[in-house]
Amino acid sequence: QDQFQLTEKVVSAEPFGNGHINDTLKVTNEKGEIKYVLQRINHLIFTNVDMLQNNIQIVTSHIRKKLEEKGENDIDRKVLTFLPTKDNKLYYFDGDNYWRVCLFIPNSKSYEEVTPELSYEAGKAFGDFQSMLADIPEGTLGETIPNFHNMEFRLEQFHDAVKNNAAGRLDEVKDLIEEIEKRAEAMCIQERLYREGKLKKRTNHCDTKVNNMMFDTETDKVLCVCLLYTSPSPRD
């Protein structure tokens, strides 16, 4: 209440959702209505909080502009709105932890188990999300977790794990290792083409699960994509 630019008095904050990276709380007003979502950012994973929040600010502003250009209605339910601190920063640091606040999207829900119909809606929504971000210039966003989606780097880690055999179960998974090796060259095509200057880095969500989006409680149509740990990665 004292640190962020909130428009309503809040009286309680309770755990919300089942995320396993950040700690998320739903924040209610005096009428018992959920108005905000407060998160403690896991800075052990996202070590550059400045970059993380700057990425999110760029992405949400870009999407909001695209929606406005399309003449969309109810835009505040179709893109996350993060609130600045009272000194206009994108997050608050209390000396130990990093915090951010966004508006709660009313009449929304998420799903852990999905039907083919929900999966179809989710696929369309992620496609729209990627399309809206396609014209963000390369170099605009920072890489929040370096090499997280770099398959060449991941294969190096894989080969080290095979060599070290720390768990002593190499003989039990030889068929799986062979399967990965068969696919290794194809897995690294994007990184190779990027190095050769044949493929640009573009903006990907990089965690396109159905439970990373909000659905309208009445129509089951997707409202917006969440968990914007967006970083650039090579793709065509």
Name every feature range the model reports, one short phrase each:
Residues 229-236:
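Conserved small/polar residues in nucleotide/adenosyl-binding loops
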Residues 208:
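Hydrophobic HxD+1 residue recognition
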Residues 40, 47-50, 105-122, 135-205, ...:
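ATP-dependent phospho-/nucleotidyl transfer catalytic cores
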Residues 1-8:
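Juxta-kinase regulatory segment immediately upstream of eukaryotic protein kinase catalytic domains
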Residues 9-13:
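Conserved N-terminal boundary motif of the eukaryotic protein kinase catalytic domain
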Residues 15-18:
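Protein kinase glycine-rich loop
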Residues 20-23, 28, 35, 41-153:
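Conserved ATP-binding subdomain of kinase catalytic cores across diverse folds
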